[in-house]
C-alpha cells in the first residue's frame, strides 16, 4: 500500500452496472476530494466473439476525450508498461499528443476524478493469454499498475 489507501470498487462476484460503479467512485470523490481519488478500471481485451483465436495483441490505456488529469495518469501507466512489458506490444495513439486512446466510455466520462481504463492484453490471443496466465505476466500487470500510480503520485506531489 506504500501509505496510500486503495479499494476494490466491485468486490461482488456479480456484474455491477456502470452507473453503480460511477456512483461509488463519485461518492469517494465527495468524501475525500476529487483530486485525492483516482479510478483505474482494469480489463482484458478481446478482438473476436470467443469462437476462435485472434491475432490482436498488446496492452493499452484509455481516457475520455479531451486533455484532463486522466491523460497524465495514463502516460505514467504507459511508462510503466513499456518498462514491465519489454517484449510485448504496447498499443498507442498519439493523435492528440499523448499515448492513450480516447473514447467516451461511460465510467471515464462520468467519474469526477482522474479515470483510466487499462486493457491488459487480449484473452482471445493465444500468446497474450499464455502470458496473462503465467506468474511473470501476472506480476508484470500488477507492477505496471502499481508503478504507474506511484509515478503519478510522485509527479502530483511535486507540482503541488
Where are each of the predicted segments found?
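Active-site-proximal helix/loop segments of hydrolytic enzymes
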Residues: 1-160
Amino acid at each position: 500500500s506504500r501509505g496510500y489507501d486503495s479499494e476494490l470498487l466491485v468486490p461482488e462476484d456479480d456484474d455491477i452496472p456502470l452507473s453503480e460503479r460511477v456512483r461509488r467512485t463519485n461518492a469517494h470523490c465527495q468524501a475525500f476530494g476529487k483530486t485525492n481519488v483516482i479510478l483505474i478500471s482494469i480489463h482484458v481485451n478481446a478482438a473476436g466473439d470467443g469462437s476462435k483465436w485472434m491475432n490482436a495483441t498488446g496492452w493499452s490505456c484509455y481516457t475520455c476525450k479531451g486533455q484532463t488529469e486522466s491523460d497524465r495518469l495514463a502516460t505514467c501507466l504507459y511508462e510503466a508498461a513499456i518498462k514491465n512489458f519489454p517484449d510485448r506490444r504496447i498499443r498507442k495513439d498519439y493523435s492528440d499528443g499523448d499515448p492513450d486512446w480516447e473514447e467516451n466510455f461511460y465510467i471515464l466520462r462520468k467519474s469526477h476524478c482522474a479515470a483510466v481504463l487499462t486493457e491488459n492484453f487480449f484473452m482471445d490471443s493465444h500468446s497474450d493469454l499464455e502470458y496473462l496466465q503465467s506468474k511473470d505476466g501476472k506480476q508484470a500487470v500488477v507492477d505496471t499498475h502499481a508503478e504507474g500510480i506511484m509515478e503519478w503520485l510522485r509527479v502530483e506531489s511535486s507540482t503541488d
